[in-house]
Regions:
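A beta-strand edge to alpha-helix "cap/lid" segment located at domain peripheries
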Residues: 2-34, 41-135
């Protein structure tokens, strides 16, 4: 019995997103970058407005890793995946719990949207967008 290509693609995307989140928690830069396109584009919560290219994306994590090292958390929830034959997107929520030592009680939940494209038969992240609601 053949598996539905859409469900196979969805399972691959979910696995890729979960492995990315695990890599973030482990501060494993090579695993974080493993499925990103060299010319990827990112919109993040902190400035700048956009990051173009894998090296700019790599550099952005240097601001976040110290926060994790102090006990911050990074957990995905409400993951939803939509796939086509060669493009897909995923959206989820990222709960960022404050480090215990920060004294802050207001954890942050941000929105995540990731755009994927099939490149040489592999799902590749071409766009990543993190945002929070404007007040």
């Amino acid at each position: 019995m053949n598996q539905n290509p859409t469900s196979t693609n969805e399972a691959q995307i979910r696995e890729l997103v979960e492995s990315w989140a695990t890599a973030v928690r482990n501060k494993d830069m090579e695993a974080i970058l493993a499925h990103h396109a060299p010319d990827m584009l990112m919109f993040d919560v902190p400035p700048p407005l956009q990051l173009k290219g894998i090296e700019a994306y790599r550099a952005s994590w240097s601001k976040f890793f110290p926060w994790l090292e102090r006990g911050g958390t990074f957990e995905l929830s409400d993951i939803s995946v939509t796939t086509g034959s060669d493009v897909a997107f995923c959206h989820a929520l990222i709960h960022c719990g404050n480090p215990r030592s920060s004294g802050r009680k207001d954890d942050l939940t941000v929105r995540l949207t990731i755009g994927f494209k099939q490149v040489n038969g592999e799902w590749t992240i071409v766009h990543e967008h993190h945002s929070e609601p404007a007040e």
